[in-house]
Each structure stands twice: as C-alpha cells, then as structure tokens.
C-alpha cells in the first residue's frame, strides 16, 4: 500500500494540467516539453476548454488545472468585466506564446467587410476567443452584422450552403478547418484594414497557407492577436505553487527546443510584457537571473537557418497529413449508432 501511494505521489508531482480552447496547441507543447524534459519527470495534461474566458476562470477555480492559454484581447475583456473583484491578483502570466490570425471566410457575393452590414456572420460560440476578437474588430470598423454563434464546423457547412454570408475564425494558420475547401466552392478570405486596437498587428494570408483559396499574386491582409500562458497565483508555501514553479523552470530551460518543435512557436518572445498584468514570480526571477529584459527579446528567438526551417515545416506538414488521413478513416469507419426503444 505504501509503495502504491509513493508511486502515485511521484507521478502526480510532475503532472500539470493546461487548458485551452483547442487541444492541438497544448498537445504540441506537451510533446515538445516532455521530449526535452524527461529527466524532470514533467508531463502536461492537455484539457479542452469551454471558451477563452472560461479557460481563464478554470485556471483560477477548477481543480487540476494549473495553466491556460488565453488571447491578449480576452485578458483585456476579463479585466473590463471581471468574474469577481481583484481578478488581476489571482491570475498571472508566465510568457507570451504565439499569435493567432483573424481569418474571415466569405461567400462569393461578399468582397469586403463593409458588405457584411446586416448580413449573417458567424462569430463562434459566446465567450470564445474568436467571439471576443470578432466583436472587437467589427465594432472598431463600424460594421454591425447579424451575428450567429455556431460551432465553426457547422458555420462552415452553412457558409457552403449560402445560409450565412461569412464566418470569423481566430486560429494559427493554416487551420485544419479550411483544409478541405475546394476551389469550385468560391469561398475566399476578406482583407482586414482600418484602425484597430493595438492588440491586433498586421499579417498576410498567402498561397503558402491556403493554396486553394489564395492566389500567389494576391495575398490577403489581415491581423493577428497574441496568446499568453497564464497561471494561478498560488501561495508560495503550497504544493501547487511548487508544481507550477517546476513547470516554469523546465519550460524556460528548454525554451529553444520547444520553439524549434513547431512552426508557430519558433519566434515567440518570453521577455515581452503583458500590460496591466503581473508576471508569475518564478518566471520573473528566472528572466532576471538569465539577464533577459524586454529590450533583449531578440536573444530569445530561435535562429533557424533555411535548411532547418524547411525541415521543420516539412515535418509539420507530414504530421498534418497524417492527422487528416486519420480523421478521414474515422469518418469512413465510424460505427452505426442504433437507437433502442426502452419502453
């Protein structure tokens, strides 16, 4: 019995839960970190969240969740409309992570965001990161559509059938959601221009991202929003504090290995600040000990040569292809569900 308890404690001492709207990014982080930090007995448990705001609340209130991946604009919204007073004292950040791109896919009869006034546009589920971003951007541009709140795959089906005019999806590109769109469907991305809050920075969608929807000579202007790794501000003498601290040390020590493991992470900056929020103390101490400051952020960027970068993207493309093949197989071989009458 004692041996079983010791084994249980040993396993759980290195297990941390991390919540995000989608598990893809947390699985990637878990694989990268675990591969580099086996000697730290560190494992990540990816948890699919119920929405961006909910993910932040889960970090503060839900048992077994130590970290969350949350968009910067969602953090701003949480501060404007906190779930309880003093939220900034409980929720702290570890580091900036990667950016998510705002992708507006429209039907053939829509050529600009202005044309979406009064039209049916899907913003995703309420309290999701996409909903928060879409609401902010459309308000800033002075465009008021008829908003629907459907899951993204269902919204894409409705867009294909012409039942809605466009959908907004905030995710790293290229997104799996758009992988199977055919050229003859005439769906295309809308450019985002105009004055927007500083959380949103310019980026382009190119034919490298979506060969079937974007031509080589006509990249689409859009914007992106950063994501942040957040944690609960545990008391320093608590077991959970030690567990979070353990993760932070391993994460920062293996940062270059983690960055090099995935295309979307190879240039995120661990030193940049998140305005209005406090960095988790062990993370702040690690950066100071390493002599890193926001002004020196470029020293934390992985320097990949052309050959390495090509290899990285090739490996990522192979993983994506395998995932699509597996998804297609599951769909084809899905068992038939028979409904039984219990009466």
Predicted regions: what they are:
Residues 13-37, 42-44, 99-157, 161:
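Bilobed "Venus flytrap"/periplasmic-binding protein-like clamshell domains
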Residues 1-7, 154, 171-185, 189, ...:
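An extracytoplasmic/periplasmic, membrane-proximal ligand-sensing/linker region
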Residues 16-23, 44-46, 56, 90-91, ...:
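Second-shell loop/turn segments in exported
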Residues 126-137, 203-276:
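Ligand-binding clefts/hinges and TM-proximal coupling segments of bilobed small-molecule sensing domains
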Residues 11-15, 39-41, 51-54, 62-64, ...:
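Extracytoplasmic
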Residues 72-109:
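Signal peptide-directed extracytoplasmic domains
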Residues 72, 82, 144-239:
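Pocket-lining segment of extracytoplasmic ligand-binding domains
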Residues 29-36, 45-86, 156-158, 174-181:
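Pocket-flanking alpha-helical
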């Amino acid at each position: 019995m004692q041996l079983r308890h010791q084994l249980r404690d040993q396993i759980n001492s290195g297990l941390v839960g991390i919540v995000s709207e989608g598990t893809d990014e947390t699985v990637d982080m878990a694989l990268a970190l675990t591969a580099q930090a086996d000697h730290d007995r560190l494992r990540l448990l990816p948890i699919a969240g119920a929405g961006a705001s909910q993910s932040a609340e889960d970090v503060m209130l839900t048992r077994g969740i130590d970290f969350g991946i949350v968009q910067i604009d969602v953090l701003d919204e949480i501060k404007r409309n906190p779930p309880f007073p003093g939220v900034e004292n409980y929720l702290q950040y570890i580091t900036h992570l990667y950016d998510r791109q705002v992708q507006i896919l429209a039907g053939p009869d829509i050529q600009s965001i202005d044309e979406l006034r009064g039209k049916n546009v899907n913003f995703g589920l309420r309290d999701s990161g996409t909903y928060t971003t879409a609401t902010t951007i459309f308000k800033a541009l002075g465009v008021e559509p008829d908003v629907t709140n459907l899951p993204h795959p269902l919204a894409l089906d409705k867009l294909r059938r012409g039942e809605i005019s466009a959908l907004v999806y905030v995710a790293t590109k290229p997104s799996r959601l758009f992988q199977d769109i055919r050229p003859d469907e005439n769906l295309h991305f809308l450019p985002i221009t105009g004055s927007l809050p500083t959380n949103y920075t310019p980026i382009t969608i190119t034919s490298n991202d979506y060969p079937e929807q974007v031509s080589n000579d006509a990249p689409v202007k859009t914007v992106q929003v950063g994501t942040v790794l957040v944690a609960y501000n545990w008391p320093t003498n608590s077991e959970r504090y030690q567990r979070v601290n353990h993760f932070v040390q391993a994460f920062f020590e293996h940062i270059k290995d983690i960055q090099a493991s995935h295309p979307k992470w190879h240039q995120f900056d661990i030193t940049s600040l998140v305005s209005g929020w406090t960095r988790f103390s062990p993370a702040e101490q690690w950066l100071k000990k390493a002599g890193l400051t926001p002004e020196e952020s470029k020293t934390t960027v992985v320097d990949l040569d052309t050959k390495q970068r090509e290899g990285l993207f090739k490996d990522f493309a192979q993983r994506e292809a395998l995932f699509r093949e597996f998804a297609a197989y599951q769909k084809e071989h899905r068992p038939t569900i028979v409904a039984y009458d219990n009466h």
